[in-house]
């Protein structure tokens, strides 16, 4: 699979989010979400999962891909908030 240079992989996104969590740049939505804790992040995951389902039922493939990307983002933020690594998850696949 060839990708444009602007396309992120799951691993690259996790590395980027890990760096934000470590460096805590001002104004970062990721940092704000991490500071808000697991409860708030979990609510976002439920919201995004519902939007994925609705997009699958009623929207275009492009809209569905966008919703899935948001669900993956929030899932990774939750992983970071709990201290999980990609290997922790990959080991369960």
From Swiss-Prot:
Compartmental location: Cytoplasm
InterPro entries: HisE (IPR008179), PRib-ATP_PPHydrolase-like (IPR021130)
Paired cysteines (S-S): none
One cellular-component annotation, GO: cytoplasm
Keyword tags: Amino-acid biosynthesis, ATP-binding, Cytoplasm, Histidine biosynthesis, Hydrolase, Nucleotide-binding
Family recorded in the similarity comment: Belongs to the PRA-PH family.
PANTHER family: HISTIDINE BIOSYNTHESIS BIFUNCTIONAL PROTEIN, HISTIDINE BIOSYNTHESIS BIFUNCTIONAL PROTEIN HIS7
Record protein name field: Phosphoribosyl-ATP pyrophosphatase
Lineage: Bacteria, Bacillati, Actinomycetota, Actinomycetes, Mycobacteriales
């Amino acid at each position: 699979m060839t990708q444009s240079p602007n396309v992120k992989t799951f691993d690259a996104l996790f590395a980027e989010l890990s760096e934000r969590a470590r460096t805590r740049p001002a104004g970062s939505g990721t940092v704000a979400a991490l500071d808000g804790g697991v409860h708030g992040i979990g609510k976002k995951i439920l919201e995004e999962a519902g939007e994925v389902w609705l997009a699958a039922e009623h929207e275009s493939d492009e809209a569905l891909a966008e919703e899935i990307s948001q669900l993956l983002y929030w899932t990774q933020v939750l992983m970071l908030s709990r201290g999980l690594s990609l290997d922790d998850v990959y080991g369960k696949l």
